[in-house]
């Protein structure tokens, strides 16, 4: 590295003061002080009623099972009455024992997920320990609250967060049969712990109705995944913004399963087998 014609390290005086200032373990707080323009939703204010036409993600479901918790999402993004994308991914592994699904403004939501992942990594590096599941859920609530201005302009992000506590001593009372917990949020950053199952997005009403009929707390992991895909199928059946399994294009829901051993995204081939079984079953019994 060359500084003033000399090869060496950067002088301390060349490092911005914000980078040298002691702070908390929150990367979001650091970024807000050092480079605030890099945070999601920092665009200038829009006139009332002038929200741009942008892709929106739709339906996400989560349910607990005997081994943990499953999060699944359809692959469709819409822009008004247009299908903006058929294979968007809306469910992500957040860290080793949690996952996040997103509904709402797709661009801001994906950016928020990236920042949330970095937030969890940064905290672990700075503090030397990982956040508890409640701590992760609270950090996400703070990030959503920071997007309130954009939400008031029609660019809302509504995530669904789920996971399993890594350390049983931190959370000795298991919420789900396998220790799985589910958190929903409102656009103002309100955090709510859900029990057994939940869904967000435009097709959530239909998905929750399907989960109410099909949910089985004693189901194993494959059974829970089947229930999640069935719920997304029902949502797609009644909600035009939710995409069902596309056997022609081989586009299937994104599924992440979280157990005490960790969070694992199921491959398209694995989900495809489940989706094909669901479609075959609906050929015989369309109502499920």
UniProtKB/Swiss-Prot annotation:
Activity regulation annotation text: The formation of the proteasomal ATPase ARC-20S proteasome complex, likely via the docking of the C-termini of ARC into the intersubunit pockets in the alpha-rings, may trigger opening of the gate for substrate entry. Interconversion between the open-gate and close-gate conformations leads to a dynamic regulation of the 20S proteasome proteolysis activity.
Keywords from the named record: Autocatalytic cleavage, Cytoplasm, Hydrolase, Protease, Proteasome, Threonine protease, Zymogen
Highest taxon of the lineage: Bacteria
The keyword Calcium is annotated on this UniProt entry: no
Propeptide span(s): 1-57
E.C. designation(s): 3.4.25.1
A GO molecular-function descriptor: threonine-type endopeptidase activity
Residue numbers annotated as active site: 58 (nucleophile)
Enzyme class: hydrolase
Reaction equations catalysed: Cleavage of peptide bonds with very broad specificity
Cited InterPro entries: Ntn_hydrolases_N (IPR029055), Proteasome_sua/b (IPR001353), Proteasome_suB-type (IPR023333), PSB_actinobac (IPR022483)
Single GO BP term: proteasomal protein catabolic process
SUPFAM superfamilies: N-terminal nucleophile aminohydrolases (Ntn hydrolases) (SSF56235)
UniProt GO cellular component terms: cytoplasm; proteasome core complex, beta-subunit complex
Cell compartment(s), UniProt: Cytoplasm
UniProt pathway: Protein degradation; proteasomal Pup-dependent pathway
Record PANTHER family: ATP-DEPENDENT PROTEASE SUBUNIT HSLV, METALLOPROTEASE TLDD
NCBIfam families attached to this UniProt entry: 20S_bact_beta
Family: Belongs to the peptidase T1B family.
Subunit structure of this chain's protein: The 20S proteasome core is composed of 14 alpha and 14 beta subunits that assemble into four stacked heptameric rings, resulting in a barrel-shaped structure. The two inner rings, each composed of seven catalytic beta subunits, are sandwiched by two outer rings, each composed of seven alpha subunits. The catalytic chamber with the active sites is on the inside of the barrel. Has a gated structure, the ends of the cylinder being occluded by the N-termini of the alpha-subunits. Is capped by the proteasome-associated ATPase, ARC.
Role, per record: Component of the proteasome core, a large protease complex with broad specificity involved in protein degradation.
Full protein name: Proteasome subunit beta
């Amino acid at each position: 590295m060359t500084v003033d014609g000399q090869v060496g390290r950067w002088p301390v005086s060349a490092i911005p003061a914000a980078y040298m200032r002691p702070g908390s373990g929150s990367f979001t707080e650091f970024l807000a002080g050092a480079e605030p323009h890099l945070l999601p939703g920092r665009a200038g204010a829009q006139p009332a009623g002038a929200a741009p036409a942008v892709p929106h993600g739709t339906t996400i479901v989560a349910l607990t099972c005997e081994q943990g918790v499953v999060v699944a999402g359809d692959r469709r993004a819409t822009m008004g009455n247009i299908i903006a994308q058929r294979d968007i991914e809306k469910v992500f592994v957040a860290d080793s024992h949690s996952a996040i699904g997103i509904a709402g403004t797709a661009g801001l939501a994906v950016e928020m997920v990236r920042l949330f992942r970095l937030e969890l990594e940064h905290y672990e590096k700075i503090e030397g320990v990982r956040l508890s599941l409640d701590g992760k859920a609270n950090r996400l609530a703070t990030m959503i609250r920071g997007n309130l201005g954009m939400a008031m302009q029609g660019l809302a992000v509504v995530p669904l967060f789920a996971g399993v506590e890594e350390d049983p001593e931190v959370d000795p009372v298991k919420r789900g049969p396998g220790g799985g917990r589910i958190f929903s949020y409102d656009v103002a950053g309100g955090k709510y712990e859900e029990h057994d199952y939940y869904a967000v997005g435009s097709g959530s009403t239909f998905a929750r109705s399907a989960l109410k009929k099909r949910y089985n707390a004693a189901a194993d992991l494959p059974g829970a995944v089947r229930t999640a895909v069935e719920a997304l199928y029902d949502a797609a059946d009644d909600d035009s913004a939710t995409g069902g399994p596309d056997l022609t294009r081989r586009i299937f829901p994104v599924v992440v399963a979280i157990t005490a051993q960790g969070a694992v995204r199921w491959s398209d081939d694995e989900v495809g087998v489940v989706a094909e079984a669901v479609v075959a079953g609906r050929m015989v019994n369309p109502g499920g």
